Amino acid sequence: MNNKLTERQILILKAIINEYISTATAVGSKIILEKYFNNEVSSATIRNEMSVLEKEKYIEKPHTSAGRIPTIKGYQYYEANLAETKISERLKQKLMAILNKRYHSIDEVIEQSVEFINNVTNLPSVITKFKSYDLLKRMDLIKINNNTAIILIVSSSGEVIKKTIKYQNSIQYNDVSTCVQIFNDRLVDTPFIELKEKLTAIKEIVRTKVHEYEFVMQRIVNYIFDINEKSTINIKGTKKLVIHPEFHDHNKLSEILNLLENTSIWEQISFMQQKTGKSVITFGQDIGIEGISVASTLIETEQNKHQIAIVGPNRMEYGKIKGLLNILKEQVEKIDHLNLPLEEINKES
């Protein structure tokens, strides 16, 4: 902890931030004295300690109130030293009940769980999926008519990518069918990020098996595997932003909405987060937008990486949100590792 702060100053700082998180109203010495010190010290003592905290830039006085609010330095100290990473047993059981349900994919588990976290925090979220970690699981060819077919590319996360192929005759259709068979034989379980390299290695095999090699290369190989390897983002709960007074200003609201859609920001946070492996708090000033905080975790399964970020004002419940994200990360990675529904995992523990 910071040696400059006494135990009493730390208690007062914690009280101010807890009150401000709950009420969004500047905090005066009277509420601190009555609620946190049970009138056991004088009001002058509380005011003096608050003056020290203000001088050290942990709190500040807003223009419209006689009370005090936390500064970014105060929030950073609170998050690092005072916010308890825990949630109530009732909240934990509700999240576990969602995780216990049977889903078709890890993506679905994450989406349903994050929607629950949105609702209990009244904050929006960003789910970033790093696509390059997906594996090719299967390719299917569906003939639509005499000159059109659809190729379905199924990924390890359950995503189905559809590609329409135009051809002129049965020879070209047969070439397409041959290619799909070769790809299923030789490319299944290849990460999408490695497909181009693997395709280079099997080009000569394709050349010996098809009649119109140039058609195959232009219309199938280059077209089908022109799959976006960049991360994709899924934003949930943006309407919840207007609940918070910090975002009543239209310019500030527009700024944070632009942030939510900025893929590079989430990649930047993910890069910083990989050093810790835990749920972390990133303050807005570190990513170029003041007045917000981002609580995030990185879920690493065998085949994919998902970053879950909860976005809100600095006045967010850090411990509660980190507690929820920690449970989500731990349980999803356990489900993936054991390849079992959570209810069966819990029977073994």
UniProtKB/Swiss-Prot annotation:
Q: One Pfam match, by short name?
A: HrcA
| InterPro entries named in the record | GAF-like_dom_sf (IPR029016), HrcA (IPR002571), HrcA_C (IPR021153), WH-like_DNA-bd_sf (IPR036388), WH_DNA-bd_sf (IPR036390), WHTH_transcript_rep_HrcA_IDD (IPR023120)
- Taxonomically, the superkingdom here is Bacteria
User: Which terms are listed as keywords in the entry?
Assistant: Repressor, Stress response, Transcription, Transcription regulation
Task: Tell me one GO biological process term.
Answer: negative regulation of DNA-templated transcription
Molecular function in Gene Ontology:
DNA binding
Coiled coil in keyword set: no
Free-text function comment from the UniProt entry? Negative regulator of class I heat shock genes (grpE-dnaK-dnaJ and groELS operons). Prevents heat-shock induction of these operons.
What family name appears in the similarity comment?
Belongs to the HrcA family.
What the entry lists under HAMAP family is as follows: HrcA
Protein name (database record): Heat-inducible transcription repressor HrcA
Organism, scientific name: Mycoplasmoides gallisepticum (strain R(low / passage 15 / clone 2)) (Mycoplasma gallisepticum)
